Amino acid sequence: MGRILAELPAEPSSTDALMLPQSTNVVVDPSADDLTAAAKEFLSTFTKPDLNSLGQNFRVYDEEHERSAGVQELYRINHINQTYVFGQQIRKKHLQFNKAVMGIWESCELLNEFVDESDPDLDEPQIEHLLQTAEAIRRAHPDQDWFHLTGLIHDLGKVLLHPKFGSEPQWAVVGDTYPLGCAFDESIVHHEFFADNVDSKDARFTSQNGIYEEGCGLEKVAMSWGHDEFLYQVLQHNKTTLPPQALFVIRYHSFYALHHSGAYTHLMNDFDREMLPWLHEFNKYDLYSKSKVRVDVEKVKPYYMTLIEKYFPNELQW
């Protein structure tokens, strides 16, 4: 059973260094021949739906629908407050890994209490989406068990919304992510709200490269704070044995300006380019599994528990 660490030490003066995965696993192209048969079998039972679970097109942010006002307001607050300085401060706050000790499945269950207010496609508790994504990947890539598990856990950083973690506001946890310390690309959802972000008026941060060097690699780029980065750092701290492909997907799955619009590629290095096909592959199941198809939790739980035991310690420091 997880437990909360009652007394927190003082915050350190600087954040922990961002670490690349140390594994040297060979990267496999998800379009390789050995996956083709499995993908074809999957496509007979899962095809990209035309509409999301609310009956609208996917990722539509500029039309009126039942959740549009709330989504727009979240991005307005997000884009005003996600500054380079804020990003550094909140990393110091949350990368001490002293908020809780609990296992992976317990953290999945915590998300039952939340709906992502930034998501125009989904109005269900998060655990439904996690299992939909994991099962969709499992059918398409039956031999890649790490990929199934990645689908299950990819949003677990949203536990930051829970009182155990200080009830962070949704704008600091969910939504699309983007680099801080350089110009905000126009492809970012609701780009217009960056006009009120102080970094938009700071000459250090307004050029294409900003404080970075071209080709420096995404691991050297400070991203807007959210559940992606938090979970990535938790997994690194707890020495997961998931391959680097999984960690890259977890860290950048909300970076739509990159994997959907092709922005910020000038900051990528060779490692990032090798990982990117897996991010594209994952997004198909992350986005288009948001439907009314329900997953029998008790039926699939034993399978995922075996994967959790394979790749994680019994309890993790969060």
Where does each model-flagged region fall?
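Active-site flanking loop/helix segments enriched in acidic
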Residues: 91-128, 211-218
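Non-catalytic interface/linker regions that flank or bridge core catalytic/transmembrane domains
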Residues: 1-106, 113, 318
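Divalent metal-dependent catalytic cores for phosphoryl transfer on phosphate-bearing substrates
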Residues: 122-298
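Surface-exposed polar/charged interaction patches
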Residues: 7, 11, 45, 114-117, ...
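Compositionally biased, low-complexity repeat tracts
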Residues: 2, 12, 51, 66, ...
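C-terminal helix/juxtamembrane-tail motif
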Residues: 299-318
